[in-house]
Structures are given as C-alpha cells and as structure tokens.
UniProtKB/Swiss-Prot annotation:
This is Nuclear distribution protein nudF-1. Signal peptide: none annotated. One of its GO terms (cellular component) is kinetochore. Keywords: Cell cycle, Cell division, Coiled coil, Cytoplasm, Cytoskeleton, Microtubule, Mitosis, Repeat, Transport, WD repeat. It comes from Neurospora crassa (strain ATCC 24698 / 74-OR23-1A / CBS 708.71 / DSM 1257 / FGSC 987). The lineage of its organism: Eukaryota, Fungi, Dikarya, Ascomycota, Pezizomycotina. The keyword Coiled coil applies.
Length: 486
C-alpha cells in the first residue's frame, strides 16, 4: 500500500503536542474496539506497538473526550461573554447621565450592596473559604464537604469540582512562582495540596508534615527587601501549634515557626512578604520577621481579645493615613514600609486594630457573634468584616472606625469568610498566568506583588481596584458563595 503524502497533524501544534494528540486518538480507537483503524493509523504514524502498548494507552483513555467537552465549554463561555458584552454596550449606549455616573463611581469609595450579583450554590456542606485567581475571573471555594469548587464569578457559573482531600477543606489561596499561578488548599486531613489551574487543576503535589488540622494557608509575595525573590514560598498554620513555610517547587518544609502555645488558626503575609501575622486560640497576635534568614524572629506579641482569635489581616499602605490618625501619629508611615497596622477578629465579637509597636489603637464593637473574616478595602478607607451574626459590616477608618454600613437579610446563616478580588495591574511583563506572554494587561502574580510593593502608597494609575467581593456562608445544611460586584 502506498504511503500517504499528506502529513498527519496540524502545523499549529508543536511536535510534542502532535504526539500527544496522536496517542489520544489511538487510545480512543482502542477503547472503541476499532483495532483495524488503530493499526492503520499506527502504521501511518510509524509508531511501534511496543512504544505505545495497551498499558500506556490507558493513560490517554478519555483524554480526547475531555478535551472535546472543554472546547464545547469554552465555546459556550465565549458566546455568553459576547452576549454579556452586547448587553453592556447597549447599556452604555442608552445610559442617562445619572446611570452613567453610578457606573463610574469612584472605586475607592465602593462598598458591597444588597442584593449580591450572584448566589452560587453547589456545596453540600458549609463553605469555609474563598479565593480569587489573580488574573482570570475564577474563584475557588472550599467546603466541609471535602471539595473545592471553581467558579466563574463574572458569569456566576460553576466550572469544575476538585476532589482530593479526605476531610473538610479549611482554606484556599492562589499564588506561586513567576510564570505560573497555583492553587493551594489545606484541610482537616492534615495535608496541604497544590493544584495547577493551567492543567485542569491537576493535583501536582501534596505537602505532608503537620501533625494536626491545617487551618490556614497563604502564598508569600516576593520582590521586596527581606522577602524571597522567587515567589515560591507558602505559609501554613496548624492545630499542632506551629507555622510552617514550604517551598512549592520542591514540596519541602523549609522552616517551622514555634511560639504559639495553642492553635494558631490564621496566618497572613505582609504585602511585601517580609512579615507574617498569626493569631489563634492562645488569644495572642504575633508578628514574625522573615528577613533574618533561617529563623523567623517574633517581633511582637499582642494580647487584648477575651476569646479565641479567628482571623487577621495586614492593613494596606493606602490605609496608613487613616490609621495613623487613629493612632495619634502626626505623620503616616511611608508607603514603602510594611506591617505598620493590623486587624484581628475574635470570638469575643470584637475587632481590634493594632499599630506596628504592638498598641491596640481601636476596638470596633458592633457584631453580635463571632467575627470570622476581615478584609481591608484596597482604597484604604474601609475595613469589612463578616460574622456568625449573619451580617457583613463596613467600618470607615476615616471616621475613627465608625460602622457605616451593615448588610442584613442577605445571609441565612453564619458567614465564614470574605475576600476582595485582587487589583488589575497593568504591566509590560504581563502574562496569561500560565507562563506564556499574551500581551495582556493583567500581570503575573509575582510581578503584581512587586508592583504593589513599589507603588502601594496610593491607588496608582497602574493599579485598578476591582470592585468585587466574595463571601462564604452556612445556609441551612448547605454552603453558599455570594458575589458582590459593581
């Protein structure tokens, strides 16, 4: 039989991609018992049977169908986005001056309003945590139902469900080294898992090492003095009373931080990655300096809460002018500094604001139950909190921390977590979040961290606040995610 002169494959594919496609087709044909067709294709490709036997073919079974359905989902998303774009364009064309002014509201003063844009339902048990992708419109949520779900917050659609943990998922966070964003999760099953968003959220690594529940996990930003340069570090907090720092490229624990005498329930890094803030069941708030090399130095230990502490957050430099006034300072700290002000929430129903010397500068009272989550407004003027009293409260730091808004009637149960979408950063080094330059205006997460470390004194023209907030809650026996957006 004469050999065909037409090259199989497409010049749009690399050699490796073409090989993977050929193997997927062969595996598909084998699964359908089309042995003759498979043999003909194998002969055309000059692929020896021993180099791609039945055992190796099993790895590729279902891959072709999965890629096909992924294309269908993407086509649907494109159609939905085109439809939404058309509607938004119609709104702009028909906008009155008053409606247009509402749409162009100053983002530094925007606050979440009821009703939420979307109420996302799929989790069978309470939602414990949420996290935004730094580039795309993806949101991850973790739940006591052992799963992580990935949503498109712009469309309000469930994209996929990730399974792997064997107990409740307690925290999630996006971040990682330059050239590729990762998703980290931690669980009551004592493990931390890393997932690759660019490869259908494949579990690429599991980090064992903690001896008890792992309740908090955060990527450590890079690019500032004293911080790791590669952005490949992750910090975790556990009921074994320790904090651990991990290298996500190797999976090794590079540092164990001891000091808490009871469960440190929450940990967060400063915007430049130099400091860590931790708090928990020993009622203490601890500030750690990572600039000393192998050992983390405990710079401050703060007490004041009367019950277990559940959450903590560093204030962004945009909040320094307001918090400096609360602290009685004549001049705000320079924007280039970090760990100047902090906030903590507790089961004592209070929120405490602290300065960098360890002084409590303000106690915010208003919640009627445990305070579960805190987030500072990127513009620096507000602090948002959620609690078991089924409310979200907004505190105006320019008015001595007065509560200026309470969202009630939105939640059916306890509100467990809150996150603000990271800013859109315009940068020449932008990538699509998977290591390939796409000329996008959305920056690599590490580039974004470096840009924030350099320009965080004000809301720079290169940094655009995204007016999007996500919360997780307990609604009856199930969990729900709510999206508030401008």
């Amino acid at each position: 039989m004469a050999q065909a002169s037409v090259q199989i494959g497409t010049p749009l594919l690399t050699t490796r991609q073409a090989e993977e496609l050929h193997k997927s087709i062969l595996a598909y044909l084998a699964s359908k018992n089309l042995a003759t067709t498979a043999a003909t294709l194998r002969d055309e490709l000059d692929l020896a049977e021993e180099s791609f036997d039945a055992e190796k073919a099993k790895k590729y079974e279902g891959l072709l169908e999965k890629k096909w359905t992924s294309v269908v989902r993407l086509q649907k998303k494109i159609l939905d986005l085109e439809s939404r774009n058309h509607l938004l364009q119609s709104e702009i064309d028909n906008a009155t001056p008053s409606s247009l002014s509402r749409r162009t509201q100053d983002p530094t003063n925007w606050l979440p309003k009821a009703p939420p844009r979307y109420v996302l339902e799929s989790h069978r048990l309470p939602v414990t945590c949420v996290a935004f992708h730094p580039v795309f419109t993806s949101l991850a949520s973790g739940s006591e139902d052992y799963t992580i779900k990935i949503w498109d917050w712009e469309l309000g659609e469930l994209e996929r469900t990730i399974k792997g943990h064997t107990k409740a998922v307690l925290d999630v966070d996006f971040g990682g080294p330059r050239g590729g964003t990762l998703l980290a999760s931690c669980s009551s099953d004592l493990t931390i898992k890393l997932w690759d968003p660019s490869d259908e959220y494949k579990n690429i690594r599991t980090l064992p090492g903690h001896d008890h529940i792992v309740s908090s996990v955060r990527f450590i930003p890079s690019g500032a003095a004293g911080a790791p340069a590669s952005g490949n570090l992750l910090v975790s907090a556990s009921k074994d009373n320790s904090l651990k720092i991990w290298d996500v490229t190797t999976g090794y624990c590079v540092k164990t931080i001891l000091g808490h005498v009871d469960w440190p329930r929450a940990v967060c890094p400063s915007h430049d990655g130099r400091y860590l803030l931790s708090t928990g069941s020993d009622k203490s708030v601890r500030l750690w300096d990572l600039a000393g090399g192998r050992d983390a130095e405990c710079r401050l230990v703060m007490f004041g809460h009367e019950n277990y502490n559940l959450c903590c957050a560093f204030a962004p430099p945009t909040a320094y002018p307001h918090l400096a006034k609360l602290a009685g300072l004549e001049r705000a700290p320079p924007p280039s500094s970090s760990a100047e002000f902090m906030a903590t929430g507790s089961r004592d129903k209070q929120i405490r604001l602290w300065d960098g010397r360890g002084n409590c500068i303000k106690v915010l009272v208003g919640h009627d139950n445990w305070v579960r989550g805190l987030v500072f407004h990127p513009g620096g003027k507000y602090l948002l909190s959620v609690a078991d009293d089924r409310t979200m409260r907004c505190w105006d730091l320019s008015q001595e921390g007065r509560c200026v808004q309470t969202l009630t009637g939105v939640y059916e149960g306890f509100v467990s977590c809150i996150r603000w979408a990271p800013p859109v950063v315009k940068d020449a080094d932008a990538t699509a979040g998977n290591g390939r330059s796409e000329g996008s205006s959305l920056a690599d997460p590490v580039v974004a961290a470096r840009r924030r470390a350099a320009t965080v004194g004000s809301v720079s023209a290169s940094v655009q606040i995204r007016c999007v907030v996500a919360t997780g809650s307990v609604d009856g026996a199930e969990g729900k995610v709510r999206i508030f957006a401008n």
